[in-house]
Regions:
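Short S/T/G/P-rich N-terminal loop/turn motif that feeds into the first structured element of a domain
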Residues: 1-56, 64-71, 98-99
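C-terminal structural segments of small proteins and small subunits
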Residues: 66-92
Length: 99
């Protein structure tokens, strides 16, 4: 199993239209064939000192293996998302894990 976790910090001055386009784009990533399971969401309302809720969107993708992740990275839907939405975030952090 290969888990790809992506955290986006959206720019504060985005219009509602730009935010909607971002969310539509990020959710489209979960439809890519090599994704076993995908989730895109906002920070939960949990409130403990150890929890970082500063991000705007968490994208969690589960793949069967690294090869499936690599197929996702070069998929046209992924390329379209980057092309159309990369200017919407000020910061992105990615954490990949395997077991």
């Amino acid at each position: 199993m290969f888990v790809h976790s992506v955290y986006f910090w959206l720019k504060p001055d985005l219009t509602e239209e730009q935010r909607a386009k971002f969310w539509e784009g990020v959710r489209s990533l979960t439809t890519i064939e090599s994704v076993r399971q995908g989730f895109a969401g906002s920070p939960a309302s949990t409130d403990r000192p150890i929890i970082d809720r500063s991000y705007s969107c968490a994208l969690i993708m589960i793949f069967d293996d690294y090869a499936e992740h690599q197929a996702y990275q070069v998929h046209p839907i992924h390329d379209k998302f980057r092309e159309e939405c990369a200017t919407f975030w000020s910061k992105v952090l990615i954490y990949d894990a395997v077991n």
